[in-house]
């Protein structure tokens, strides 16, 4: 299967008009002949600057530069006959060949991508335009099932060659909306479930993915390649998944927009699962508007994901989320809270000044910002950073995830064909059997320092939903929702004694304990790029709200984006970096 896909990919690249070097046969040319025919160049090679936006200039696309092109701009090119979807795919293929060998954001190309683009071009020529995503290329994290010539493996060799029964529901939705599936993105293997001490963005099948701003540092995860590929201009948008931070964190670290929806607003059906209580699917894009275009085609009830039934009566009556997009004038009179204790007080030293500067700009635009809108229960927020084992066993988020994962992965694998992997036990056995690649034991593979201790911890529970499990479910829900985000949003002004619900909580999304609270609650969050750290890596400002409050995140996320007009360009610092693990 892998060799077949390689040949398919090479065939598509040949069709793309790119020369494909062939391996020299040793039967016709000896090594000595090759050496003798070479001219020795004694000139010292001068390496290009490794910290510049000029290192990988975006290739021209029919004399147009698509760098940072939005969905609206791409549609404008196609509507006016300047570019076709096929042209745009060719251009992203050029960019893929230029930068992916360094940043490793895309795991696998779709061999049929040009065929799909051509079919959508034919539709456009015949007056059929499905919507704003018609002809727009995208990628999905390698834990979204795609029923095509690509493998869905969560980055693991254990599932290579397996056959999924169907497209994931949200992938099907995007295909029907006219989006062009370009490929699968790299990720942290098994979406960070397998190990507790690991190199973020690494998988056995995909290798180490890297942040295009600084290739030596942690690119965030587990939707690493999704964010990296958008930031590197290899694709228009991408899909990610999140159980705890896996959309917000990589989007923030790569200077793009990440929208994590309420659990149950977008389907998880056909996605390699972790926890039904916290898993969600969402877009990673260049702008809030682009993210909402994608989200608009993703959300909705899916009878195969019962959690999506919870959205009934809690979404816009007309089904339109695009109407909530706004500009900076919407900030006039808006009321935001700063949960200072634990969250803001743990903001990074090289981020806090810029974060507060942005808060001041928001105030100057007419918003009212209330400080110390804190959570009621602060004991569930670690001062030592992200920790899903915090608390006793009947209070821990990790208890819930470990039990859920054991059962959910078995259910998912029950429908996958052409594989001997049917359970968590099978995965653990595979990793032990192929130790040199999958690192089943600690300190065998540098990227998996703790081996597969996450899997072993889940295996130890065996999926048993006992009293301890249900106590943990209730505790996590109550402390993150009623005593957490909802408590902070329901504010009483000490000066006027007026009580009201805030329009959102502004948080430093670069602080892992912030997105962890939204993850535990199953509540929505958005992150916006606002600056870069001293090491050149981006960071962001987040907005959190209660369940089903995506309209608020869209309205004020787009308003703040319009106010700031901020965009950082990757400088590919140390673009030849090969360090593993990354920190």
Swiss-Prot record:
The active site is at residues 141, 222, 246. Disulfide bonds: none annotated. It catalyses: a monocarboxylic acid amide + H2O = a monocarboxylate + NH4(+). It holds the Pfam family Amidase. InterPro entries: Amidase_dom, AS_sf. Keywords: Cytoplasm, Hydrolase, Signal. Residues 1-19 form the signal peptide. Belongs to the amidase family. SUPFAM superfamilies: Amidase signature (AS) enzymes (SSF75304). It comes from the Eukaryota. GO terms for cellular component: cytosol. GO terms for molecular function: amidase activity; hydrolase activity, acting on carbon-nitrogen (but not peptide) bonds, in linear amides. It is found in: Cytoplasm. PANTHER family: AMIDASE, AMIDASE C869.01-RELATED. This is Putative amidase C869.01. It is an enzyme of class 3 (hydrolase). Its main location: cytoplasm. Its EC number is 3.5.1.4. It comes from Schizosaccharomyces pombe (strain 972 / ATCC 24843).
């Amino acid at each position: 299967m892998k060799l077949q896909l390689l040949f398919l990919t090479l065939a598509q690249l040949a069709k793309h008009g790119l020369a494909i070097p062939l391996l020299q046969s040793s039967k016709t040319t000896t090594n000595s002949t090759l050496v003798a025919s070479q001219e020795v160049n004694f000139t010292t090679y001068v390496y290009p600057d490794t910290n510049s936006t000029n290192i990988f200039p975006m290739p021209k696309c029919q004399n147009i530069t698509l760098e940072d092109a939005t969905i609206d701009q791409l549609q404008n090119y196609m509507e006016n006959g300047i570019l076709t979807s096929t042209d745009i795919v060719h251009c992203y293929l050029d960019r893929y060949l230029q930068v992916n060998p360094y940043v490793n954001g895309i795991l696998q190309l779709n061999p049929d991508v040009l065929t799909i683009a051509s079919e959508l071009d034919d539709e456009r020529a015949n007056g059929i335009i499905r919507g704003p995503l018609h002809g727009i290329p995208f990628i999905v994290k390698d834990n979204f099932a795609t029923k095509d010539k690509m493998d869905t493996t969560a980055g693991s060799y254990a599932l290579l060659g397996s056959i999924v029964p169907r497209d994931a529901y949200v992938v099907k939705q995007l295909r029907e909306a006219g989006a062009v599936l370009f490929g699968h993105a790299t990720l942290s293997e098994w979406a960070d479930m397998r190990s507790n001490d690991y190199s973020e963005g690494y998988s056995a099948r995909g290798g180490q993915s890297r942040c295009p701003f600084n290739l030596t540092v942690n690119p965030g995860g587990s939707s690493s390649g999704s964010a990296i590929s958008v930031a590197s201009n290899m694709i228009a948008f991408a899909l990610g998944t999140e159980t705890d931070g896996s959309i917000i964190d990589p989007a923030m670290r790569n200077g793009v927009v990440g929208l994590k929806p309420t659990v149950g607003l977008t389907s998880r059906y056909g996605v390699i699962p972790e926890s039904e209580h916290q898993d969600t699917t969402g877009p990673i894009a260049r702008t809030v508007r682009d993210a909402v275009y994608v989200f608009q085609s993703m959300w909705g009830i899916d009878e195969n994901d019962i959690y999506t039934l919870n959205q009934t009566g809690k979404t816009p009556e007309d089904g339109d989320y695009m109407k909530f997009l706004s500009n900076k004038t919407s900030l006039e009179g808006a009321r935001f809270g700063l949960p200072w204790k634990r969250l803001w007080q743990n903001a990074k030293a090289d981020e806090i000044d810029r974060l507060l500067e942005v808060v001041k700009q928001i105030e100057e635009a007419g918003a009212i910002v209330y400080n110390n809108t804190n959570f009621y229960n602060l004991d569930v927020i670690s001062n030592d950073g992200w920790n899903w084992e915090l608390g006793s066993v009947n209070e821990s988020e990790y208890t819930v995830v470990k039990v859920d994962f054991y059962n959910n992965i078995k259910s998912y694998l029950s429908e996958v064909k052409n594989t001997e992997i049917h359970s968590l036990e099978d995965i653990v056995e595979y990793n032990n059997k192929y130790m040199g690649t999958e690192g089943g034991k600690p300190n065998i593979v540098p990227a998996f320092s703790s081996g597969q201790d996450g899997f072993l911890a889940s295996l130890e529970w065996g999926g048993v939903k006992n009293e301890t499990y249900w106590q943990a479910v209730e505790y996590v829900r109550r402390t993150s929702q009623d005593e957490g985000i909802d408590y902070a949003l329901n504010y009483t002004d000490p000066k006027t004694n007026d009580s009201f619900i805030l329009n959102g909580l502004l948080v430093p999304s670069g602080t892992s304990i912030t997105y962890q609270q939204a993850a535990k609650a199953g509540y929505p969050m958005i992150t916006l790029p606002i600056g870069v750290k001293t090491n050149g890596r981006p960071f962001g400002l987040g907005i959190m709200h209660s369940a089903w409050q995506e309209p608020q995140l869209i309205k004020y996320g787009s308003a703040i984006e319009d106010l700031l007009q901020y965009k950082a360009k990757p400088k590919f610092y140390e673009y030849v970096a090969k360090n593993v693990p990354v920190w």
